[in-house]
Amino acid sequence: SQLVKANGWIEGLTIASIILGVLLGGQLVGHHLSAALLSIDIPMIDFGIHTAAEAAIAALILVYALAAWFNTRIPHTGVEMRPLRQHPQRSILASTLALLPDFWACNSRLWHDKLGQISLSTTTLFWGAGGNLKFIVLAWAGVALGYNTTQASALTGVVAIGTAVGAVAASMRMRLDMATRVIPLGIAMGLLLILMVFISNIWLAIPFLILLGGLGGFLVVPMNALLQHRGHNLMGAGRSIAVQNFNEQACILGLGAFYSLSLKLGLSVFGAITVFGMVVAGIMLVIQRWHASNCRNHSEELDHLLHIARQDTHH
């Protein structure tokens, strides 16, 4: 499926950019790179940059400027945009609040779809876990390997390598109607997080983190493609992406709060990672059983939805 292949690129690059951002941030505040940035001197111009943090922020401003330039190169699709303010006499806030009923209706519609609910719950959990994985790796590396922030941030780049490999592999091997077969990989991800507490050697940690990232990349690409397919058919791509992003960001905040609370309640880093891994594996097991129940009780509806996915010639 072309949609799965496209998601291989999109998801792989998105996850890689998030994790590599942590890698870049760790290096920017490190002694060597920050010293090199502070040594840059342009005659007759004083930028007022005197600390490592200020130099790091200045470097990120350049990254944002580059990203903004990339956005200007996105071709116009010709789709007519829906105006935010349908009634000019209303304020922007009032116009935004007026869209909420439509948003919640779309959210409910996707959660009640027999394939949409499985793909949305899987991608939501993945992003919730992946969004907090960088903090887990930093904390684990500090305790298990004795690394400082700069050294530990380099390990997050290792996860990005695995994610990219997994995403590419999924785009080559998976089809849209096969997406639900990757659910067990989510359970494996949670169990691998638990096994992380037993690793204290860097040469064992590197292939382990590559494997962890690879499972994530292979999991999220077909599931995200299936979610976009169902969302496009149910409500259109724009609303579907809005629903997806809302649920994923909420999960990132929720799991992040759960991990932080575990540490605050006195759990060690290893204990918090173990509990976090158990939660991820447990929720994925529930999703697996949920899909199995749908297959038993709504087999005709699922067969029809999968037939639509197989016939999706637009992607």
Predicted regions and their residues:
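A single, central transmembrane helix in multi-pass transporters
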Residues: 23, 29, 33-57, 106-165, ...
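Hydrophobic alpha-helical transmembrane segments
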Residues: 5-85, 157, 162, 270-289
